[in-house]
């Protein structure tokens, strides 16, 4: 099961340093020297030879500020270095990362470890740690390959006999991304003022304001000659407010602001105005009726549509899912076939840094296997064209297209970066709304639904469970066909299965917008973006959302005692 969360950060512009800086870099020097030494030494140290060795070192700094009810709630700073080792033995055709049937796909892959290394940047200390961890990884790889051979001897042949790994050319790139710290004292005061504003309402049970920023530089070196250093800066300002209805349903509103500099964050006045809007929406939600299960026409506003595409199609076009024996392989044999409306084109391009001035969180230059990021055409005019690929080949797709991703400590698999949906025929949003009403009348439905805002979603692609998706709306309206005003409603989740749902898209607006988020799957949490216009879906199914049985607080918050 994979989850998509609302963004907590965005990409900032890097400061690229000269090549002379690379020669002085103790991290790069330690990684390269120990890689060369280890690869030469381990290559024929055992009967099963080492054929590939890669290191990824992530050096990060993080700061987080939070305020609640007019007081500073958290102020923390962290530094960390994480080393991941990709160790492969035998041959590309069959190696220690091969799926052991009966295990989860990633449980049999021990190529990657989440390991702390010396913080000081001392080359000798770094090499000692790298040597220690590489030795352990080599022994584990040998052990795992023995399990692979035994498993293959007693299980049925795979449907897709593609190799476990594919070659990639050597890459050389060096940049150091630095982050200038903001005026923390000023931000502490600003957060306290923002948070005090939300404390003035008795129906708000919890609220808060946060700002966080992170500086991250990644080193990628491997036995094929790749030497890459690249980095990102991430920053966000966000607020949230929650309440609970008398029937136990948790409600929330909020906003997050992604920018490429602290100067680019909205003014205090703009944030206060947005808070006032969110407060009014939360109050209205408390009195809104619950929607009964429904199947019929609906509009997904642009950001909500981005999450929808991420869940119903994005994960199912990740290449390794077409090969894994326990995967549903929904689209594995549909390349060249029509899978959705003729107006829909879908691609993923991690090289995009922004869309109409909005930074894209899914941007990266090189993936976690040292392959340069590439634009990948997935669907063209409704026809499936390809898959997102890491260096694990599948039938008909022998090479990576730069989409191998992971968070530290987990094996790399194919993942989305910046998923973009484009429509060849569009209308204005008011025209799309008119098409919704017309479709409702055609189907004899008294109303349709409009999904304004979402919190994320999740999907399942394994054969062991229902291969369905769920998207979690936050703000939904009924649009009536008889001219009554739109009505805010609550308590619904969007559900469905991918092949049917993807085929029901019938029209799109010209209001493309960005959803920035963080996606969780078997290779961990990675930053992603989706770009999409609002879309009309001729048939969308919703079910009642989960809720607690807990009543609202007996007493009002203490700030409201009279």
Predicted features by range, described:
Residues 3-15:
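Bacterial N-terminal signal peptides
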Residues 17-371, 380-383, 396, 446-447, ...:
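Active-site bordering "gate/hinge" segments
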Residues 231, 388, 488-490:
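Short linear motifs in exposed loops
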Residues 254-256, 390-392, 490-492:
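Residue-level structural signal for beta-strand termini and adjacent loop
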Residues 349-351, 389-392, 424, 454-456:
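Histidine- and/or cysteine-centered catalytic micro-motif in compact active-site loops
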Residues 362, 422-500, 516-523:
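Hydrophobic alpha-helical bundle architecture
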Residues 372-374, 474-475:
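Short loop/turn microsegments at loop-to-beta-strand junctions
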Residues 385-439:
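C-terminal, non-catalytic macromolecule-binding modules
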């Amino acid at each position: 099961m994979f989850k998509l969360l609302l963004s907590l950060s965005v990409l900032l512009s890097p400061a690229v340093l000269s090549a002379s800086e690379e020669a002085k870099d103790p991290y790069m020097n330690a990684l390269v020297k120990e890689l060369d030494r280890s690869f030469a030494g381990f290559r024929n140290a055992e009967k099963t030879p080492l054929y590939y060795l890669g290191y990824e070192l992530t050096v990060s700094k993080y700061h987080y500020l939070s305020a609640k009810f007019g007081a500073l709630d958290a102020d923390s700073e962290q530094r960390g270095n994480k080393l991941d080792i990709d160790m492969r033995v035998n041959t590309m055709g069959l190696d220690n990362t091969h799926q052991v049937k009966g295990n989860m796909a990633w449980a049999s892959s021990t190529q990657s470890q989440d390991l702390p290394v010396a913080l000081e940047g001392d080359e000798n200390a770094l090499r000692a740690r790298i040597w220690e961890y590489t030795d352990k990884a080599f022994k584990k790889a040998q052990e795992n390959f023995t399990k692979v051979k035994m498993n293959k001897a007693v299980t049925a042949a795979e449907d897709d006999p593609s190799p476990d790994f594919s070659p990639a050319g050597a890459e050389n790139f060096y940049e150091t991304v630095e982050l200038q710290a903001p005026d923390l004292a000023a931000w502490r005061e600003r957060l306290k003022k923002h948070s005090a504003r939300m404390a003035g309402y008795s129906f708000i049970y919890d609220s808060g304001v946060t700002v966080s920023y992170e500086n991250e530089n990644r080193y990628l070196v491997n036995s094929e000659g790749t030497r890459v250093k690249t980095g990102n800066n991430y920053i966000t300002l966000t607020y949230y407010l929650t309440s609970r209805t008398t029937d136990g349903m948790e409600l929330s509103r909020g906003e997050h602001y992604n920018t490429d500099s602290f100067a680019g964050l909205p003014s205090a006045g703009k944030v206060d105005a947005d808070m006032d809007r969110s407060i009014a929406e939360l109050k209205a939600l408390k009195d809104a009726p619950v929607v009964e299960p429904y199947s019929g026409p609906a509009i997904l506003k642009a950001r909500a549509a981005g999450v929808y595409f991420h869940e119903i199609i994005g994960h199912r076009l990740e290449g390794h899912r077409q090969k894994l024996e326990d995967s549903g392989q929904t689209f594995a044999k549909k390349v060249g076939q029509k899978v959705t409306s003729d107006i829909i084109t879908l691609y993923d391009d991690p090289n995009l840094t922004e869309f109409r001035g909005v930074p894209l969180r899914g941007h990266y230059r090189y993936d976690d296997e040292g392959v340069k990021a590439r634009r990948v055409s997935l669907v063209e005019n409704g026809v499936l064209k390809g898959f997102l690929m890491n260096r694990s080949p599948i039938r008909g797709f022998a090479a990576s297209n730069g989409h191998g991703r992971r968070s530290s400590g987990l094996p790399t698999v194919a993942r989305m970066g910046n998923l973009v949906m484009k429509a060849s025929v569009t209308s204005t949003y008011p025209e799309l709304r008119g098409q919704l009403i017309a479709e409702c009348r055609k189907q004899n439905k008294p109303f349709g639904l409009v999904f304004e805002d979402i919190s994320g979603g999740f999907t399942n692609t394994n054969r062991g469970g229902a291969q369905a998706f769920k998207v979690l709306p936050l703000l939904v309206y009924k649009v009536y066909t008889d001219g009554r005003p739109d009505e805010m409603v609550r308590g619904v989740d969007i559900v469905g299965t991918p092949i049917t749902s993807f085929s029901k898209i019938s029209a799109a607006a010209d209001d493309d917008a960005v959803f920035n988020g963080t996606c969780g799957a078997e290779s961990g949490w990675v930053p992603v973006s989706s770009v999409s216009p609002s879309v009309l879906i001729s048939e969308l199914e919703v079910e009642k959302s989960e809720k607690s049985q807990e009543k609202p607080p007996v007493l009002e918050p203490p700030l409201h005692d009279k």
